[in-house]
Amino acid sequence: MTSTQRSQELFARAQQFTPGGVNSPVRAFGSVGGHARFIQSAKGSKLYDVDGNEYVDLVCSWGPMLLGNAHPEIVEAVQKAATNGLSFGAPTEAEVKIAEMIVDRTSVEEVRMVNSGTEATMSAVRLARGFTGRPKVIKFDGCYHGHVDALLASAGSGVATFALPDSPGVTGASAADTIVVPYNDSEAVRAAFEAHPDQIACVIAEAAAGNMGTVAPQDNFNAKLKEVAHEHGALLILDEVMTGFRTSYNGWYGVDGVAGDLTTFGKVISGGLPAAAFGGRADIMRYLAPEGPVYQAGTLSGNPVAMAAGMKSLELATPEVYDMVRANADRLAGLLHEALDREGVAHHIQRAATMLSVRFAEGEGHNFDDMKAADTFRFPAFFHALLDNGIYASPSVFETWFVSAALTDDDFDKIEKALRPAAQAAGKAK
């Protein structure tokens, strides 16, 4: 690792004009200390900062870069689309094609494009309320569904990184219809329905949680959620912004086979550009304007350049690619375990298919309380030792790590080498 002076200078400049110097809080390294690295370029499995340092990328832009950075075919598709026009404010064939691809690979019957995961979940909740005529929403402690006021209560990594129970600016009225229960506790969901009869529009859950660290649903949890919701006339919204087309060819739906009444998507379907979607049963989706009374719109929704990137990303994400990503996740998990075990550091490698994180305690964490109860103080030293040795991991203990299909044997050699001092640093942390 050479100097990071240029990153430090840019961070100082940014703090004069941008709150915290960043445009999304976790990028500020607030929970691990130090200063943000300013990235200049990326290619394949690597990131390159403004000081010329190279990093093996284990963040993948928080999930979208399944195929690696700047994949030449995706770049070419974006360039070609851009030459035809950047935005039209009118329908395009690309919107039709990507909708067909999403419907073909998931449980949804109809889909609408939006610009971000936050928009997708916000719109899905509004639609569920409009369809059922009910106001209340059940969400889970530690699950993050974007920075929608009503869903920021107990929202996991987005606020946990800064040790905030929720966000100032979210009024009591905004959160009054949000019921928060522990993740992986279907009986708590049942109790909430019994306490609020005929008031709950939907249950929203990450299909597999990735914002309290990585926490997989246990004991057919998603299926139980759907069963309880339907017993009480409510809908199940599965948030696949993170898991969709990341955890398998069919997203988390391909892992446990549970179809949400509504499902949200993002990240991989964007190819790295701003795009997301929500979809579901046709009878529900047809409550959206212009067919139905529930209003939702967006000037840049279905942007042709983003659609080109998303289509090419999905086209290239073949079953063989998922085999590679799964093998890479398994390999990384093995190296993490070996390094920490060698140093006698209590840990568990949390897994949800190809997503993973490190819990610094014995045994698997099943909810946000479990994840917070670990030795989280070990993570900053662990993270910085990796970073100093050229490995760019997620800069929060409550975030998920992502691998791409572009990782090489040489990358894994670098990871293995960097994990030795990182595990030692974690063991010495107090």
From Swiss-Prot:
GO terms for cellular component: cytoplasm. Keywords: Cytoplasm, Isomerase, Porphyrin biosynthesis, Pyridoxal phosphate. The keyword Cytoplasm applies. Its cofactor is pyridoxal 5'-phosphate. It is found in: Cytoplasm. It catalyses: (S)-4-amino-5-oxopentanoate = 5-aminolevulinate. Pfam families: Aminotran_3. Pathway: Porphyrin-containing compound metabolism; protoporphyrin-IX biosynthesis; 5-aminolevulinate from L-glutamyl-tRNA(Glu): step 2/2. Transmembrane segments: none annotated. One of its GO terms (biological process) is protoporphyrinogen IX biosynthetic process. GO terms for molecular function: glutamate-1-semialdehyde 2,1-aminomutase activity; pyridoxal phosphate binding; transaminase activity. Homodimer. Belongs to the class-III pyridoxal-phosphate-dependent aminotransferase family. HemL subfamily. This is Glutamate-1-semialdehyde 2,1-aminomutase. It comes from Corynebacterium diphtheriae (strain ATCC 700971 / NCTC 13129 / Biotype gravis). The lineage of its organism: Bacteria, Bacillati, Actinomycetota, Actinomycetes, Mycobacteriales. The gene is hemL.
